[in-house]
Amino acid sequence: MKDVQLVIDELVKWLREKVKAAGAKGVVFGLSGGVDSAVVAGICKLAFPSNALGIIMPCHSHPEDEEHARLVAESLDLDIEIVDLTPTFDTMMRSFTIDKSRMAAANVKPRLRMTTLYYYAQNLGYLVVGGSNKSEFTVGYFTKHGD
C-alpha cells in the first residue's frame, strides 16, 4: 500500500507542476465510467480539489456507463459536465458522402471527445489530462488525435 501512495503522491506533484508551468488553473478529463477514468478522476481531484472537471460524453453508449461515471463523480465530490455527443456524431456520419468503414467511424468518437475536452480546457484555462495506460500503449490501442 505504501508503494501505491508513493505513486499517487508523485502523480499529484507532477500534475501540479505541469499545470503551473503551463500557467493553467486546473484540469479537465473525460469521465467514461471505466476504471482508467475513475483513477484519473481521483488523482486529478487530489491535485486540484476545486479545479478538476470531469466531462461525461456519451455517444451511442450504454446507459450504465454514464451511471458509473456519475457514481465516481459523486464519490469524489467532483464537478462534472455532460455533453451528449450522439447528435453530433450522427450528423457527421450522415454528412459524409463516401463509404464509411467501421474503423473510420469508430475513430470519430474519440476525436469528438478530444475536441470537447480541449474546448472546455481552453475556456476554463485548464489542461487536458488523458487516461491512456501502459497496456494500451504497449498494444497500440489508441486513436491518433483522440482522447
Q: What label would you give each PLM region?
A:
Residues 1-143:
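ATP-dependent adenylation/nucleotidyltransferase module used to activate substrates
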